[in-house]
């Protein structure tokens, strides 16, 4: 039983919680039917990241032109870099009845919720703040100042989890993926998402 319009599934987390890791594992599952909406960013690619797969990497001037032309569903500036979601792909895919999966920063998720309150908003939480710091430091790509800034922002973002519908603890990647899939199955069965279609069906009897 599925509603005709696709679900917008929004996943975000504090820096260092492993959002990209969870997304990659989730999309490696054969039963995953989400359409991944790739974000646009002005930050430099990290080792192993591929343009057009992990992000669309843009120059700052290009991104600002997209803002002016209203080509972004949401955008935010985080640690000196822009991040945003192209709007055309999202709306087209939802209209086709396909689920769209976004992984975006907390600021961006709050913008999206204003435009798509019917979306499913999932906050990926760390097991603890000490574990969060270990993950950020373990990257080996950040200066001490950047690490401290990320931790400060992460604490602020955790305090904003009330804006989300669900909280999934990322203690183990596989378990986090199972929880996310279970949430989506349940959301597709919510009465308010499917009732009108069944009412239309019974009108013809």
From Swiss-Prot:
It comes from the Bacteria. Keywords: ATP-binding, Cytoplasm, Kinase, Nucleotide-binding, Transferase. Residues 6-185 form the Guanylate kinase-like domain. It catalyses: GMP + ATP = GDP + ADP. GO terms for molecular function: ATP binding; guanylate kinase activity. ATP binds at residues 13-20. Pfam families: Guanylate_kin. Its EC number is 2.7.4.8. It is found in: Cytoplasm. InterPro entries: GK/Ca_channel_bsu (IPR008145), Guanylate_kin-like_dom (IPR008144), Guanylate_kinase (IPR017665), Guanylate_kinase_CS (IPR020590), P-loop_NTPase (IPR027417). The keyword ATP-binding applies. PROSITE patterns: GUANYLATE_KINASE_1, GUANYLATE_KINASE_2. One of its GO terms (cellular component) is cytosol. It is an enzyme of class 2 (transferase). Gene3D superfamilies: Guanylate Kinase phosphate binding domain, P-loop containing nucleotide triphosphate hydrolases. SUPFAM superfamilies: P-loop containing nucleoside triphosphate hydrolases. Belongs to the guanylate kinase family. Essential for recycling GMP and indirectly, cGMP. PANTHER family: GUANYLATE KINASE, GUANYLATE KINASE-RELATED. This is Guanylate kinase.
